[in-house]
Amino acid sequence: MHSIKRPNRHRFLYFVRHGQYERSPEHPDGTLTELGRLQAETLATRIQDLPLDAIWASTMYRAQETAQIIADRHFPHLEVQRSVLLREKAFPCEHDAWVKALSRHRAPEDRLERIAARWFRRSNRERHELVVCHGNLIRAVVTRVLGSDVNSWLRMSTHHCGLTRVTCWDDGRVSLVTYNDVSYLPDEYISVV
């Protein structure tokens, strides 16, 4: 007797930090630098064979710009969807001041719960979703997936266009598959700040 194979209803999430950016008076959220565009184009080539069902982006311009480059290059059939949940809200200050103040900040736990409810939920079919957002948010999500102290994200680093893969199994388990993969980037394309 043959058993009936159940359909795969796993959700595969690909979290990506936006490309390198710079701020200006015209774009306080930041726009991609030439290097940031190269990082996004290289990432697009790296993931071109994924059967993506959706591309999500933070409402901040640098994340939208990164997501649009990826969509335009290899996924023109997908419209980039935006979510305010993916915004980098916890640390709006300049980087140097942020580094000095790290010990005073806490990850936004209530927002992590809303993100988990939205993206870690079970699917009625196999789904592959790209989520272009921010390093702080990705690190906080990883701590939640691992069940570690929410403030352990302060000891992690996320590179521009680093790829973090999370699998949400149909039985409710969530697993970290890779964190901050930049192995596809040439050394001269790797950046953090």
Language model features by range: what are they?
Residues 69, 140, 144:
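Active-site signature of alpha/beta-hydrolase-fold catalytic machinery across serine-
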Residues 13, 125-136:
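Generic beta-sheet signal
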Residues 19, 135, 182:
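Active-site metal-binding loops of divalent metal-dependent hydrolases
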Residues 135-139, 175:
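GST superfamily/GST-like fold recognition
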Residues 4-82, 105:
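Active-site-proximal alpha-helix that buttresses catalytic centers in soluble enzyme cores
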Residues 60-64, 135-136, 160:
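Alpha-helix N-cap/helix-start capping motif
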Residues 1-11, 76, 81, 91-103, ...:
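Acidic, low-complexity terminal tails and accessory targeting/binding regions
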Residues 115:
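A conserved mid-domain beta-alpha-beta active-site/ligand-binding segment of alpha/beta enzyme cores
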